[in-house]
């Protein structure tokens, strides 16, 4: 617990600072924008690339016998730094943004959702291919007490291939030997299209409500608070899971099959819903089916809570399934 304390103390400080700046703004109508900023930050912790990056780094450091407790925190700080810097810069361009807000909302909203949806579908399909390969290795290893060297190398190759940005920045992970080394990689992840669109949204929200600079600064701080909390919890969860998973080679591959399968489901599910909502809105489609109507009006800010629960349920489910069905393979 002592090893986690500095990171969670920093997270508490971010929450306190964000709330203090928010209340100093003294504008009740600004609270909705602040809540949105916090949820946008929390949402990022469940992105396929965030999960893959933190997971791969923790696995790498754990295998090397090094401290991996701060991976999730430093990654989120790198990503959040982009948001904080760009929000401050955006404050000086508010006049231009106000003038072009109608155009940005019309074009940016549609294009942003389409790009995000297609991006998630591509990620989901790529990870689905990796999942199938992992399942093949798992089936082959049923009769063995341990995985062969070739199988271990193939597993490592597959696991480090998850996530699109993760693939692009893969060479940089060779330089990560301490938790804080992930900070610049998190910064590079923060330069993505979705983060840029969210920065614009935060800046425009501040401008529309005519909040002070102090109030505007509360948004990226709350964004960082939400992201750092869930990224750090993700890291803690992954570290605990790997402590269990690395005790035997079969547990290791079984655990990664469970996590990869869940990542595939989330990416495809969210990607399809985003595309469905854009198409149905632009074509003015009306549905009688209750499920389709629910999907059409689904709020993604609420989805983050469901994903947290889904990850916990999936891990517990896979753990008990292992105990019931596969633990005999270790004997």
Curated annotation (Swiss-Prot):
Entry membrane topology: Multi-pass membrane protein
GO molecular function: high-affinity nickel cation transmembrane transporter activity
Domain of life: Bacteria
The keyword Transport appears for this protein: yes
Primary localization class, coarse: membrane
Residue ranges, Periplasmic side: 27-33, 88-113, 200-225, 274-302
UniProt topological domain (Cytoplasmic) ranges: 1-5, 55-66, 136-178, 247-252, 323-331
GO CC terms: plasma membrane
InterPro entries in the record: Ni/Co_transpt, Ni/Co_transpt_high_affinity
Transmembrane regions listed in the UniProt entry: 6-26, 34-54, 67-87, 114-135, 179-199, 226-246, 253-273, 303-322
Entry's Gene Ontology BP terms: nickel cation import across plasma membrane
UniProt-annotated location(s): Cell inner membrane
Keywords: Cell inner membrane, Cell membrane, Membrane, Nickel, Transmembrane, Transmembrane helix, Transport
Family: Belongs to the NiCoT transporter (TC 2.A.52) family.
Entry function: High-affinity nickel intake protein. Imports nickel ions in an energy-dependent fashion. Necessary for the expression of catalytically active urease.
Protein name: High-affinity nickel-transport protein NixA
Source species of the chain: Helicobacter pylori (strain ATCC 700392 / 26695)
Gene: nixA
């Amino acid at each position: 617990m002592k090893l986690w304390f500095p990171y969670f103390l920093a997270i508490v400080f971010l929450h306190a600072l964000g709330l203090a700046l928010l209340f100093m703004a003294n504008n009740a109508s600004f609270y909705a924008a602040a809540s949105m900023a916090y949820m946008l930050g929390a949402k990022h912790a469940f992105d396929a690339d965030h999960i893959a990056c933190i997971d791969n780094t923790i696995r790498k450091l754990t295998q090397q016998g090094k401290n991996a407790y701060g991976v999730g925190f430093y990654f989120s700080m790198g990503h959040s730094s982009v948001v904080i810097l760009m929000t401050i810069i955006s404050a000086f361009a508010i006049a231009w943004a106000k003038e072009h807000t109608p155009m940005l909302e019309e074009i940016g909203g549609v294009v942003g959702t389409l790009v995000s949806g297609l991006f998630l579908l591509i990620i989901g399909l790529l990870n689905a291919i990796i999942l199938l390969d992992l399942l093949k290795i798992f089936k082959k290893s049923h009769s063995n007490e341990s995985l062969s060297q070739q199988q271990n190398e193939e597993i490592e190759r597959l696991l480090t291939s998850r996530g699109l940005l993760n693939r692009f920045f893969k060479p940089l992970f060779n330089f990560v030997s301490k938790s804080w080394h992930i900070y610049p990689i998190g910064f590079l992840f923060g330069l993505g299209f979705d983060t840029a669109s969210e920065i614009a949204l935060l800046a425009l929200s501040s401008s529309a409500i005519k909040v002070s600079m102090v109030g505007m600064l509360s948004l990226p701080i709350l964004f960082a608070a939400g992201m750092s909390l869930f990224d750090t919890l993700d890291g803690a969860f992954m570290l605990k899971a790997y402590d269990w998973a690395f005790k035997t080679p079969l547990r290791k591959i079984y655990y990664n099959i469970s996590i990869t399968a869940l990542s595939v489901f989330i990416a495809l599910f969210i990607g399809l819903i985003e595309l469905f909502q854009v198409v149905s809105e632009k074509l003015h489609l009306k549905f009688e089916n209750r499920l389709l109507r629910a999907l059409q009006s689904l709020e993604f800010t609420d989805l983050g809570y469901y994903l947290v629960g889904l990850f916990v349920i999936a891990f517990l489910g896979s753990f008990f399934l292992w105990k019931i069905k596969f633990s005999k393979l270790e004997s």
